[in-house]
C-alpha cells in the first residue's frame, strides 16, 4: 500500500461531521461564526472604547465569573497578546523576588524560562518531570510565586490544582490554564491567578490573554508597580486591571475574538456550566483512551491514568505504524490537525477533545483511524 496521503479514501459514512481535532487553534462552532456574521457590523470596525465593544468585554467578564463561580474579590482581567505575553506580564508584575515552577512539557518550561532569565528576579526554582508525567512545585524558601500548567498542551498531561502545602501565606499560585480552562475541573479558590487564551476550549482565536485574579494577586500587582520597578506599558498588569474594570483593554483588541469568546462562554453556561463541560470532555477523552488501550498498535503516551488529560489525548504508535503517514491520510480526507507537538518528537497522534468537539465526532475519528490503519497494514 502506498504511503501517499491520497492513496486511502475514507468512506463518507465514517467521516465526522466536523473534522477539526486540533489542540489550538481549535474548533470554532458554526453557531459562533453565524453570531459573528450577524453582529459583526455592530462591533467590527468600531471603537473599543464605546458601548458595543465594551458590552462584549462585559459579557466575557460576567460569563467567566459565572462559569468559574468566582468568590468575592476575584476579578477577570484581559489583555492583548495571548498566554506567551502573559508570561512576561507575570514576570514583571506578579513575581516579587523568586518563582518556583513545575515543568513537564514545552509550555510550562517557557514560563519558567521567562522568570529564570528576568534580570531583576532571583534564580527560579524549577522542578522537572519527564514528558508524559506531571508535577506540582513544592514549598521553596523565598519563593513568592508557584506556577505550573493545569494542562500541558504539548504532552497531554493534566494536574490537580491545589495550593501547595507549606508555602508562604502571601505566596501566589499562578496556573497556566491555556488549554484547561473551560474543559477541566478547577476550584478557583485554590488559585491566585488562573490565566488562559481563548483558542482552545474557549472556542475563539488567539491573541488575547485572560487572567482570573484573586484579591491577593491584585494587591501584589499594585505592590510591585508602586515599588518603582520598570515595567513596559504594554506589559503593565495594573494598567490591564484598571482597564478591565472599565470593560476594555489597554490597546485595541481583535474584536472578532471577543465576540466568538463571549458566544462560547454563554453556550457553555447555557448547557450547564463547568460541570457539563468537564463531563463532556471526560467522556470524549475516555473514548480515545479506551480505544488505545484496546489497540494492538497504539498505547497511551501518558501511562498513569491520573495524569491523562481530558482535553488533549496523546497516543503513541509502535514502529510498525508511521503516525505521520496516518495523520497525512486523515488530513487528505478532511480530518485535520491530529499531528503531535512538533518538539516532542514522538511517533504519535495528538487529539483534542475540547468542549466544542462533539463526542460523536470523536467516535467517528476513531473509526477513521481504524480504517486507515487497516489500509496501511494490508
PLM regions: where:
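PLP-dependent enzyme catalytic core of the Aspartate aminotransferase-like
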Residues: 2, 18, 343, 347-378
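Active-site C-terminal subdomain of aminotransferase-like
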Residues: 27, 199-282, 286-289
Amino acid at each position: 500500500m502506498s504511503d501517499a496521503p491520497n492513496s486511502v479514501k475514507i468512506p463518507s459514512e465514517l467521516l465526522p461531521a466536523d473534522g477539526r481535532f486540533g489542540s489550538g487553534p481549535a474548533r470554532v462552532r458554526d453557531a459562533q461564526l453565524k453570531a459573528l456574521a450577524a453582529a459583526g457590523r455592530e462591533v467590527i470596525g468600531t471603537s473599543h472604547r464605546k458601548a458595543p465593544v465594551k458590552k462584549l468585554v462585559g459579557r466575557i467578564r460576567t460569563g467567566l465569573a459565572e462559569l468559574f463561580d468566582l468568590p468575592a474579590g476575584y476579578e477577570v482581567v484581559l489583555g492583548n497578546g495571548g498566554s506567551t505575553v502573559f508570561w512576561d506580564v507575570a514576570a514583571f508584575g506578579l513575581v516579587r523576588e523568586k518563582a518556583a515552577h513545575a515543568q513537564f512539557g514545552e509550555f510550562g518550561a517557557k514560563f519558567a524560562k521567562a522568570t529564570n532569565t528576568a534580570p531583576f528576579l532571583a534564580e527560579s526554582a524549577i522542578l522537572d518531570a519527564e514528558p508524559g508525567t506531571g508535577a506540582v512545585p513544592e514549598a521553596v524558601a523565598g519563593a513568592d510565586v508557584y506556577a505550573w500548567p493545569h494542562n500541558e498542551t504539548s504532552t497531554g498531561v493534566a494536574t490537580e490544582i491545589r495550593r501547595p502545602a507549606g508555602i508562604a501565606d502571601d505566596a501566589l499560585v499562578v496556573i497556566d490554564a491555556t488549554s484547561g480552562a473551560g474543559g477541566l475541573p478547577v476550584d478557583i479558590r485554590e488559585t491566585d491567578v488562573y490565566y488562559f487564551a481563548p483558542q482552545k476550549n474557549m472556542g475563539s482565536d488567539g491573541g488575547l490573554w485572560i487572567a482570573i485574579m484573586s484579591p491577593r494577586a491584585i494587591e501584589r500587582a499594585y505592590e510591585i508597580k508602586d515599588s518603582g520597578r520598570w515595567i513596559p506599558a504594554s506589559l503593565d498588569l495594573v494598567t490591564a486591571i484598571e482597564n478591565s474594570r472599565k470593560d476594555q483593554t489597554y490597546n485595541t483588541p481583535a474584536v472578532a475574538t471577543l465576540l466568538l469568546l463571549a458566544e462560547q462562554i454563554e453556550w457553555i453556561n447555557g448547557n450547564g456550566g463547568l460541570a457539563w463541560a468537564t463531563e463532556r470532555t471526560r467522556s470524549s477523552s475516555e473514548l480515545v483512551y479506551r480505544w488505545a488501550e484496546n489497540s494492538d498498535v497504539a498505547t497511551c503516551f501518558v501511562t498513569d491514568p491520573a495524569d491523562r488529560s481530558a482535553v488533549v489525548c496523546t497516543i503513541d504508535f509502535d514502529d510498525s505504524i508511521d503516525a505521520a503517514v496516518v495523520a497525512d491520510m486523515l488530513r487528505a480526507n478532511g480530518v485535520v490537525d491530529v499531528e503531535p507537538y512538533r518538539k516532542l518528537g514522538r511517533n504519535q497522534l495528538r487529539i483534542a477533545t475540547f468542549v466544542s468537539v462533539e463526542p460523536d465526532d470523536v467516535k467517528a475519528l476513531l473509526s477513521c483511524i481504524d480504517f486507515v490503519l487497516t489500509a496501511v497494514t494490508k
